[in-house]
């Protein structure tokens, strides 16, 4: 026997326990939802007073003074109340899956309240939160010192400091995750990620810094923007699996995904579309492996090379734009993609106020090849969505031919009805995630949900009635818009502040008011 053969035999016998068995023992890998470090790392503790100081120093809408009581952090404090509980913030790491079902890891935040007040100990409700789109590969919602982590501070101030246990995943592909991409808007994966984070967090309770705080059995699911979509997908998945959700409140999410992307390709281009398109198309390629043979089939030459691995990134958004990795606004060429679409790529829209936003989506150095846009539009015309641009079935196209539209149909959420009470919150002038998504979900549920379903919709732009539980939120939201517009005019804006309002609308204006409304909704359950 050769020395190599003898060595291999010796190793095999060693693996078999010295030759006592002919079966090699292989240690199983971590299962989904396994907490990979127990106890988890504690990142910070906050007294109620120190959390209040941190919140006020970190969060305020751009251009709005901190002493404006109806906006940003001070509005949240007014609606959520002064922090009652001390909180401990833990960084959890757990096992989950990627977009193609591959084993991977992810991380997130576990915020645990404690204190002498009865609201801060014993069996407490759990909020499971899904965050919005971020390009930062290093994003960690558990790091409450980060200047860009408004969501983490919102959660700490509104929920954890008021006695809710908070679980908030960073998602696979971020922070310490071993996945080299993020499975963006893939309903099956993102809901599994959320459920796995919840499972891991529950196994870490009671936490060392809050030994008297336990999971009380009530679960609330919410999220904003991308996270609004993820929250809805998670409620759907949990209820389908027989897991109890007490209530849910998706905020400003792209729920009717197939219709939303159709609208974008027809010419109603949302703000920030190049980032979303890159995340979406490359994630679907990694999950389904059929979106394109080559990235150059979809993306223009200046961007195609390396775009599969571009997001999330170690570069800031401004650096991504400055270095020519992505265009800031121009998704499409201003030249129609062929004569057949010359007069039909921008259908009439009731969203007149968003016309300037749509226009920004067309320009030089655009991201998506006209040939691919033409293929998409041809398929959309041959296999139209059932709710946009014309309402027929109310659901995604029955048999789309283009692989991207097939993937969008697979991930569209117009195919279920909630069992637990649900609140949808947003604003109908949103230039980033169109209110169309909420309208189409509302329309679908009006036709398909049982009469007993408890579904509420809060449009912050709508007029308040005398008995409206969200009348204050609507009024104060309007005042915040006026303040941002007035501040822009004061600093030289000649458009009445419209651009400033549009720029702040999705991430800064709507978010705090929806967060406060969601807290009120959860408290009432």
Each language-model region and where it sits:
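Short, surface-exposed "cap/lid" segments of acyl-processing enzymes
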Residues: 98-107, 111-163
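Accessory cap/linker subdomain of secreted extracellular hydrolases
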Residues: 254-415
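Primarily recognizes the serine-hydrolase "nucleophile elbow" in alpha/beta-hydrolase
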Residues: 200-271
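Alpha/beta-hydrolase active-site loop
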Residues: 184-208
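Catalytic-loop region of hydrolases
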Residues: 20-117
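Short beta-strand/loop motif that positions the catalytic acidic residue
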Residues: 423-430
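Short alpha-helix in the alpha/beta-hydrolase fold that links the catalytic acid
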Residues: 420-421, 433-447
């Amino acid at each position: 026997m050769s020395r190599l053969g003898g060595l291999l035999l010796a190793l095999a016998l060693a693996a078999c326990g010295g030759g006592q068995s002919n079966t090699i023992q292989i240690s199983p890998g971590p299962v989904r939802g396994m907490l990979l470090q127990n106890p988890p790392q504690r990142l910070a503790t906050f007294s109620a007073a120190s959390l209040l100081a941190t919140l006020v120093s970190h969060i305020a809408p751009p251009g709005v003074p901190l002493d404006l009581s109806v906006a940003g952090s001070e509005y949240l404090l007014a609606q959520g109340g002064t922090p009652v509980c001390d909180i401990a913030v833990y960084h959890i790491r757990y096992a989950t899956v990627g977009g193609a079902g591959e084993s991977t890891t992810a991380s997130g935040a576990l915020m645990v309240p404690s204190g002498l007040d009865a609201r801060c100990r014993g069996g407490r409700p759990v909020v499971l939160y899904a965050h919005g789109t971020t390009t930062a590969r290093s994003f960690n919602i558990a790091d409450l010192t980060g200047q860009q982590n408004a969501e983490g501070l919102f959660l700490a101030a509104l929920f954890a400091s008021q006695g809710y246990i908070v679980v908030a995943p960073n998602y696979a592909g971020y922070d310490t995750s071993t996945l080299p991409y993020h499975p963006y808007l893939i309903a099956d994966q993102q809901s599994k990620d959320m459920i796995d984070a919840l499972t891991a967090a529950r196994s870490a309770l009671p936490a060392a810094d809050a030994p008297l705080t336990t999971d009380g059995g009530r679960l609330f699911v919410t999220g904003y923007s991308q996270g609004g979509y993820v929250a809805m997908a998670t409620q759907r998945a949990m209820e389908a699996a027989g897991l109890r959700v007490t209530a849910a409140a998706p905020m400003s999410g792209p729920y009717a995904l197939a219709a939303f992307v159709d609208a974008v390709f027809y010419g109603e281009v949302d703000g920030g579309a190049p980032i979303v398109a890159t995340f979406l198309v490359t994630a679907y390629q990694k999950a389904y492996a059929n979106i394109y043979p080559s990235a150059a089939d979809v993306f223009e030459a200046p961007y195609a090379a390396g775009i599969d691995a571009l997001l999330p990134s170690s570069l800031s958004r401004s650096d991504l734009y400055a270095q020519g990795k992505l265009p800031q606004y121009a998704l499409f060429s201003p030249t129609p993609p062929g004569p057949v679409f010359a007069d039909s790529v921008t259908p009439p829209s009731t969203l007149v106020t968003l016309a300037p936003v749509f226009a920004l989506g067309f320009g030089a150095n655009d991201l998506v090849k006209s040939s691919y846009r033409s293929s998409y539009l041809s398929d959309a015309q041959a296999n139209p969505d059932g709710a946009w641009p014309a309402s027929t079935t109310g659901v995604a196209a029955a048999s789309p031919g283009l692989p991207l539209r097939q993937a969008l149909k697979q991930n569209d959420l117009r195919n279920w009805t909630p069992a637990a009470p649900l609140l949808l919150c947003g604003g109908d002038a949103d230039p980033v995630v169109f209110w169309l998504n909420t309208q189409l979900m509302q329309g679908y549920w009006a036709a398909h949900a049982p009469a007993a379903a408890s579904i509420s919709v809060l449009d912050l732009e709508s007029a308040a009635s005398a008995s409206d539980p969200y009348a204050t939120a609507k009024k104060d939201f309007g005042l915040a818009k006026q303040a941002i517009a007035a501040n822009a005019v004061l600093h030289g804006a000649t458009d009445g502040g419209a651009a400033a309002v549009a720029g702040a609308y999705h991430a800064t204006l709507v978010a705090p008011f929806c967060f406060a409304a969601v807290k009120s909704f959860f408290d009432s359950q």
